Amino acid sequence: MKSNNELCRYVPSMMLFLLFEAVAVTLWLTKDNLFYLLNFSYIGGCLGMGTALFTAGKRYARRFVQLAVGSYMLIYLGVISRENMQIEGFWYYLFLGVFEAATIHYAVAKIFGPLLFGRGWCGYACWTAMVLDFLPYKQPQKPRKEKLGILRYVMFALSLALVSGLFLMKVAHLEQIMFWLFLAGNALYYIAGFVFAYLFKDNRAFCKYLCPVTVFLKPGSYFSL
């Protein structure tokens, strides 16, 4: 009986893995691209293993998932494969009218995903938070500045305006530009993240005040299961 109860604790982790496997197989078959099977199987495997380790009381379980998934998306997908997985990449593929790369990523992790697992993206997979969580202010030392939350909407609007402008002006070599925007955008995110962390004595100050992705995350998180 005790062993059955122990196994039941890991059911959510197994369900999470199976959910990503379902996405992996569906995209692999519908888009006839093996990459989707490997990509989502890897991410789902890391998330399933990490949450299982967390359930088992392993101290660094969440950090393991952050590094495994965040580094993969930043270095392999972003730098090596030259896919802009930032919000600008989402607008880019959306305006092209294709459902791949950043549009799939945003649909799964940031638009519909939060209905199932809330802000799991922020805690387990975000490559910006992955680095910021190494800073010394794990417990916020100052009250939250609610009014500064409007800055995330400014950032959201600026990213939309930037990519819209590039399309409207019919700028050449957009794919290459999006890659450089990915590199520059991440550098700016990290710089802003460090500055805000030290100003507000809070590792996640950037996430609370500047991150434009929260505009997508908040609606689904309110109704999260």
List PLM regions with ranges.
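Non-ligating segments of multi-cofactor redox enzymes
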Residues: 1-225
